[in-house]
């Protein structure tokens, strides 16, 4: 009987450790699904955000001039470079997910509501309009 109680306690402790997740577990550098950008996710005050730290096509044809955020709907932001643009903002952690955030897509200049879910070394990032039902999920990989 003592062995059963001990084994049950060990199993419960192990399962709790496996299924519990730190809110900061999402922090780090991620490679997007297309493998053409790396995004660093960090904590800003009590929320999580992410900025572009590398892109495959960072420069214009001349190889020197950094590409700009030319498709941004806000004309005042079109002159900023793609590098270091904050594309994830406002995420809060709730029960294994990062929710209530926004994701900006510099390829089309649009911002969407977003949520994220961590699964091992992959991050499911869902952008949507209105309800999460009406959206698209991409899977990012953690960069070691």
How should these model regions be labeled?
Residues 21-30:
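Cleaved targeting-peptide boundary
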Residues 30-32, 100-106, 125-128:
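Short beta-strand segments that buttress and anchor functional surface loops
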Residues 32-49, 53-71, 75-93, 117:
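Short, solvent-exposed loop/hinge segments that bridge or flank secondary-structure elements
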Residues 35-38, 109-113, 134-137:
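Short, surface-exposed coil-to-beta transition loops
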Residues 42, 102-122:
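C-terminal/domain-terminus segments
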Residues 55-57, 104-108, 129-132:
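Short, solvent-exposed aromatic-acidic interface loops
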Residues 120-122, 130-144:
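Edge beta-strand at a domain terminus
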Residues 1-22:
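Bacterial Sec-dependent N-terminal signal peptides
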């Amino acid at each position: 009987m003592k062995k059963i109680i001990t084994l049950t306690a060990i199993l419960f402790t192990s399962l709790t450790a496996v299924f519990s997740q730190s809110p900061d577990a999402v922090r780090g550098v991620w490679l997007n699904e297309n493998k053409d950008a790396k995004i660093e996710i960090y904590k800003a005050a009590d929320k999580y955000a992410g900025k572009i730290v590398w892109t495959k096509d960072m420069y214009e044809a001349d190889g020197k001039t950094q590409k700009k955020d030319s498709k941004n709907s806000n004309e005042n932001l079109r002159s900023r470079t793609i590098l270091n643009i904050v594309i994830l903002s406002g995420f809060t952690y709730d029960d294994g997910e990062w929710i209530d955030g926004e994701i900006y897509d510099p390829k089309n200049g649009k911002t969407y509501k977003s949520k994220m879910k961590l699964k091992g070394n992959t991050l499911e990032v869902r952008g949507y309009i209105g309800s999460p039902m009406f959206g698209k999920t991409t899977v990012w990989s953690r960069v070691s």
